[in-house]
UniProtKB/Swiss-Prot annotation:
UniProt organism field: Potos flavus (Kinkajou)
The name this protein goes by in its record: NADH-ubiquinone oxidoreductase chain 2
E.C. code: 7.1.1.2
Family of the protein in this entry: Belongs to the complex I subunit 2 family.
GO molecular function: NADH dehydrogenase (ubiquinone) activity
Database matches in InterPro entries: Complex_I_Subunit_2 (IPR050175), NADH_DH_su2_C (IPR010933), NADH_UbQ_OxRdtase_chain2 (IPR003917), ND/Mrp_TM (IPR001750)
């Protein structure tokens, strides 16, 4: 993709997200979503293969459907209340429509089917944008309308998403699909706490974005897309592969890594709100995600696949690729647990 075109597309994606985040008017919010969606499609199609075209089409259909439901909810709210503002949304029918539309945009269960297929069909860099930046706008709207959201509706979607995210990743060998199912599960954790403590949802989103960005950057660094290629990366990048496995366990929420922080704080927040069964179910279902991450770690680190290269290290190395943001991102993704008491202000 030529640099001028890339600059225009990237600026449109960023502008669309900023419009959604800063707007308190439903029409401007909807326009921001449309800017974001239409600008990200060329990013998904940049490889110009049948698979990427199919993935971009699936993404467009899912997002366009969600946008139509969102507009239906906005118009219903306008007819019943006579206002375009996002704050003080008192009508429950319109609020439910908007919540369903936003869950579809996020890929929460039961509207999660497009997420693994689209992520698998695009390149690693496009998948990184899809699973990180594209989550910011819908979650910012959920944050703004959280007082008017039906807690039961979001709780059902959250528990179903954590279950689907853990169950769906069990049989996967494609790393992009594993991260897609991980995204579904993480979105479920964020949705679960949205109606009780939206600021905690924002913290979870920040931690998730940093961990996922680090993982995708390391996959791009080592050119790994499957479990097999990741195990072969030991020959060329033993340190990078070790970092990938640590990030995987952090994404799974294994203490004492940083991924444990949001799960810990969300369970604590739900318990403070006299929710006992829900956090118990969430913690049990999170073991499914942790299991496939641990299995991936075991398959990669302890059971090396047969390879024609008999040496542990290659004598000739490629030139080092410069990734300036990678080091601080990895530190944040793995070593933030001691700072948890400082974050308790969110509770």
């Amino acid at each position: 993709m030529k640099p001028p075109i890339l600059i225009i597309i990237a600026s449109t994606i960023i502008s669309g997200t900023i419009v959604v985040m800063m707007s308190t008017h439903w029409l401007m919010t909807w326009i921001g979503f449309e800017m974001n969606m239409l600008a990200v499609i060329p990013i998904l199609m940049k490889n110009f293969t049948p698979r990427s075209m199919e993935a971009a089409t699936k993404y467009f259909l899912a997002q366009a459907t969600a946008s139509m439901i969102l507009m239906l909810g906005i118009i219903t709210n306008l007819l019943l209340t006579g206002q375009w503002t996002m704050l003080n949304n008192q009508n429950q029918i319109a609020s439910n429509m908007m919540t369903i539309a936003l869950t579809m945009k996020l890929g929460l269960s039961p509207f999660h089917f497009w997420v693994p297929e689209v992520t698998q069909g695009v390149s690693l860099s496009s998948g990184m944008i899809l699973l990180t930046w594209q989550k910011i706008a819908p979650l910012s709207v959920l944050h703004q309308i959280s007082p008017s959201i039906n807690p039961n509706l979001l709780a059902i979607a959250a528990i179903a998403s954590i279950l689907v995210g853990g169950w769906g990743g069990l049989n996967q060998t494609q790393l992009r699909k594993i991260l897609a199912y991980s995204s579904i599960a993480h979105m479920g954790w964020m949705a679960a706490v949205t109606t009780y403590n939206p600021d905690l949802m924002t913290l979870n989103l920040m931690m998730y974005i940093v961990m996922t960005l680090s993982t995708f950057m390391l996959f791009m660094y080592s050119s790994s897309t499957t479990t097999l290629s990741l195990s072969h990366a030991w020959n060329k990048f033993p340190l990078i592969t070790s970092l990938i496995l640590m990030l995987m366990m952090s994404l799974g929420g294994l203490p004492p890594l940083s991924g444990f922080i949001p799960k810990w704080m969300i369970v604590q927040e739900l318990t403070k709100n006299d929710m006992i069964i829900m956090p118990t179910l969430m913690a049990m279902m999170a073991l499914l995600s942790l299991f496939f991450y641990m299995r991936l770690t075991y398959a990669t680190a302890l059971t090396l696949f047969p390879t024609t290269n008999n040496m542990k290290m290659k004598w000739q190395f490629e030139s080092t690729k410069k990734m300036i943001l990678l080091s601080p991102a990895i530190v944040i993704s793995t070593m933030m647990l001691p700072l948890t008491p400082m974050m308790s202000i969110l509770n």
